[in-house]
Amino acid sequence: MVTVLDLKAEFQKLTMLKGRTPASPPSDRKGAFANPAPYRDGGIFMAKFAGISAWERHPKGDEIVQVVDGATTLYLLTDEGKQSFELTAGMMAVVPQNTWHQFVAPDGVCVMTATPQPTEHLRIDVDDPRTVLDG
């Protein structure tokens, strides 16, 4: 079955979540996130926010991230340390399987992802989730 999405229309349905933090409860996130289509073992997800996401990782596969509007800094924690990537509208990144990552978008971002499930989130403000969970 083919799924066709009008990305502009889908993003217009979302409201901008301002002041997002890693600890933002689901009630704050309501209306700023959508899962418009399934994809393989996960889904296509859309988000519209300004602030800082929770750290997350995907143990079963890579995540494809595309910035549709705005900008974000994508932080990845690797064996070499913390890496940062500045992403603006029209750019994408592939986050490797099981890699902790976080989005920081002080001025706001509209992002679409192809995300495998399950996703592990760490909803506390830490510099490195590995020190809390893996170490």
Predicted segments — roles?
Residues 35-38, 54-59, 76-77, 84-86, ...:
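Short histidine-centered beta-strand/loop micro-motifs
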Residues 88, 97-125:
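Ligand-binding loop in jelly-roll beta-barrel domains
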Residues 78-97:
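Short acidic-glycine-tyrosine-enriched beta hairpin
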